[in-house]
């Protein structure tokens, strides 16, 4: 995974993730095979910030029903990226 845009898929925009932005913690959906080092390098390259630490979680897809048919959403990986104190915030999230 050499391209940083293949690692960082999209931001997670929830009430909890918005509250964590005050503490310079940003949440992203990332590729399932990406590790913490790859995620750190990708965020630093895309957003031009300094990353202090990365926490990752494997999220289990929810069971969904459509009438009598049962299906399941895909499993996905979530990363919470904490920026250093001297680093500026990520502009992508500022208007939300």
UniProtKB/Swiss-Prot annotation:
Subunit note: Part of the 50S ribosomal subunit. Contacts protein L29, and trigger factor when it is bound to the ribosome.
Protein name (database record): Large ribosomal subunit protein uL23
Pfam family, one: Ribosomal_L23
Family in the record: Belongs to the universal ribosomal protein uL23 family.
Function description: One of the early assembly proteins it binds 23S rRNA. One of the proteins that surrounds the polypeptide exit tunnel on the outside of the ribosome. Forms the main docking site for trigger factor binding to the ribosome.
Keyword rRNA-binding: yes
Taxonomic classification: Bacteria, Bacillati, Bacillota, Clostridia, Peptostreptococcales
Gene Ontology terms: cellular component: ribonucleoprotein complex; ribosome
Organism whose genome encodes this protein: Alkaliphilus metalliredigens (strain QYMF)
GO biological process terms held by the UniProt record: translation
A GO term for molecular function: rRNA binding
Keywords (A to Z) from UniProt: Ribonucleoprotein, Ribosomal protein, RNA-binding, rRNA-binding
């Amino acid at each position: 995974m050499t391209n940083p845009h293949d690692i960082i898929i999209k931001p997670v925009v929830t009430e909890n993730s918005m509250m964590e932005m005050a503490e310079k913690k940003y949440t992203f959906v990332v590729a399932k095979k990406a590790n913490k080092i790859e995620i750190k390098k990708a965020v630093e390259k895309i957003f031009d910030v300094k990353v202090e630490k990365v926490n990752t979680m494997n999220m289990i897809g929810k069971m969904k029903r459509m009438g009598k048919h049962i299906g399941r959403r895909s499993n996905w990986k979530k990363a919470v990226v904490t920026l250093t104190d001297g680093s500026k915030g990520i502009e992508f999230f500022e208007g939300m």
